[in-house]
Amino acid sequence: MQQNMIIPSFWTGTAIIGLVACAYVSYQCLLSPLARFPGPFAAKLSKGWRAYKTANGQWHRKLVDLHRKYGHVVRIAPNELSVGDPSSFRKIYSPAEAGNGFNKAACYSVVQGNRPFDLTGERNEKVHSEQRKLVATAYSMSSMVHFESKVNVVIETVIHKLEARCRKTIDLGHWLQMWAFEPTRPLLNSLKPDVIGSVSFSQPFGYVESGDDEGVFKRIQNAMGSAAWLMHAGWLFRLHQKLIPICGNWLAVNDRNGYFFQVACREVSGRINRGGDDKDIIGQLLETQKIKPQLKDLDISFMMTSNVFAGSDSTSIAFQSIFYLLLTHPAAHDRLMRELREREEKGELSDPVSFQEAESWPYLQAIIYEAMRLYAPAAFVLDRVVPPEGMMIEDKFVPGNTVVGSSAWVIHRNPEIWGPDVDTFRPERWLDDSTFLIDKKGALQPFSFGPRNCLGRHLAYQEIKLALAKLVYHFDLELNPKCGDWDEQKNFTFWVKPPLWVNLHPVKS
């Protein structure tokens, strides 16, 4: 008798679950305010679809395919839209709109953790604006004048190391990554000093000198890769954080607010105790602190931690993509080298090449911009929350609290903006050439746009322009056949880059 009662209960429960599931699917596909926007069926039902696509490292390419299939606006989760045209991009990220409620989405809480001062993860626009004003001067274009000599020292070290490896095949990407890390000093007091290190702390890390990063890059990449998919599985991150006292830390993303932050605190404390008037980022922040005491020592430590995560990989991928594209396009490489010799003969280049000289070289600028168009350092969607009053996208109403965002990778690969040769490396599109009038060059946004754009973009451009000018001035490079295909690389907020094997030769006189 009891067994007979269990069977109907089972089928009743199954029927209820089935009805609820059907109702949910029907709502998301037919009745949801976002039902009018096209997208993959699975994406309409669960954020898990986006998390999975992110975790396999091909989300940036999947997004391009989706936009080419469905159009400018694609539904990528039950309450999320990806937007792929510049006008909507500017509407979402522009200064005028940012003050009206386009806050960062909840997924950024994974990045922020428990940090009260975090320009990357802070979701509230008002708080972010106040924090950014406190530190902006240290990252301004005017501050770059003080940093050029520090960047040059590291470049000269790289050149010296590469000269010892001439007429050999080397992984140029390895050296470029260590160089990108050096200028901001990767904050590691326990490591030997090098541009992130030199510019942030006036002490480099020593990676270029030793040729070994001592596992630090891998640790940063693990943290960034962990954050990439957890940002779309926030419930799992929150559950993990509550279980840390019982199970310990299993997520690499916590290194940003743990290991690296602790090291940053030691570094900042040591710098304060050491004193001096070094013209580096931390020195400028300490000067700001004198007139704006609300900037605490702890806040400076938070900023120094961000320097490592925001600066090292984005600059490195820009370096490596520039050289990869240059060496796989002989016509562009030959023109650059020809112009180099012409400018040298006219006395327009010195040794070492100055930032002003690199800045005034149009074709060198064109190569950099075109490479950053094809391999944008930040290839993921920058999620924002639509304000309560909602917004219009392509004559369609998007209700408040919907998550919307754009990816530079999608906008930079949009043939409506860049023309039918959108996937082709053509530096000429950045010069005065009527062939490329269709291009809307203002759509290039490798460092985002508006009040949330990358604070370190001026430093990144300075490093990239100086490094490219000086390396082609000193070396002849050719791609080795064993170099892998970069079109297959994966992205997890950082790029999984194959070795950049090149044959290195001293420059021909």
Swiss-Prot record:
It holds the Pfam family p450. The keyword Iron applies. Disruption phenotype: Reduces the production of heptelidic acid. Keywords: Glycoprotein, Heme, Iron, Membrane, Metal-binding, Monooxygenase, Oxidoreductase, Transmembrane, Transmembrane helix. One of its GO terms (molecular function) is iron ion binding. One of its GO terms (cellular component) is membrane. It is a single-pass membrane protein. Glycans are attached at N491. Gene3D superfamilies: Cytochrome P450 (1.10.630.10). It is an enzyme of class 1 (oxidoreductase). Pathway: Secondary metabolite biosynthesis. It is found in: Membrane. The chain crosses the membrane at residues 5-25. Its EC number is 1.-.-.-. Heme binds at C454. Its cofactor is heme. It comes from the Eukaryota. Belongs to the cytochrome P450 family. Cytochrome P450 monooxygenase; part of the gene cluster that mediates the biosynthesis of heptelidic acid (HA), a sesquiterpene lactone that acts as an inhibitor of glyceraldehyde-3-phosphatedehydrogenase (GAPDH) and a growth inhibitor of the salt-tolerant lactic acid bacteria in soy sauce brewing. This is Cytochrome P450 monooxygenase hepC. The lineage of its organism: Eukaryota, Fungi, Dikarya, Ascomycota, Pezizomycotina.
